[in-house]
A protein has these predicted regions:
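Terminal low-complexity/charged segments
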Residues: 1-164
Length: 164
């Protein structure tokens, strides 16, 4: 991993886009770039680990800021969103990856061995949405009691009626 610190250049987003699309043609689609931001969609959840390893090892994105789930019941899917930061080589540029996870197979590979910080984000996402991160070293609850049998961030989760 290159740890050279460089001053920001407005060509970095295009460079990152090009490297991702060249390496993963047909596996990733860069949907948007703007100053210090690159947005991309991973087309098949089976490719997420390989793409994340490349982003970490070859593009030097060394920190995962956020990993979260989003529920899209009308589309019969959830999404996992990865927000990844680079402090050195592409200093200050954030890469946001999104990947669809269909309701009928809520499994995706862990990236906690790529970025250690993903560990707790994946645990929280599993606990609140029910997305299973395969091969996670410790997929267990953080916030809710062990007796919970539902996932409170899913849109299908119903709050109790106010009976005041």
């Amino acid at each position: 991993m290159d740890t050279t610190i460089r001053e920001y250049q407005d060509s970095w987003e295009a460079e990152i886009k090009s490297k991702l699309e060249d390496k993963f043609s047909g596996k990733i689609e860069v949907t948007k770039t703007e100053t210090r931001r690159v947005y991309a969609k991973v087309l098949d959840k089976a490719d997420i680990k390989e793409i994340c390893k490349f982003v970490h090892d070859d593009l030097s994105f060394e920190h995962i800021n956020c990993l979260c789930g989003v529920d899209y019941p009308a589309e019969n899917k959830m999404q996992v969103i990865y927000e990844i930061d680079n402090y050195t080589f592409y200093r200050g540029v954030i890469l946001e990856l999104e990947v669809d996870v269909p309701y009928d197979d809520l499994h995706i590979e862990t990236v906690s061995d790529v970025w250690g910080g993903a560990n707790w984000h994946e645990r929280e996402t599993w606990e609140l949405f029910g997305i299973v991160f395969d091969h996670h070293p410790r997929l267990e609850r953080l916030l809710t009691p062990d007796t919970y049998e539902f996932f409170p961030m899913r849109k299908s989760y119903k709050l109790r009626e106010d009976k005041r």
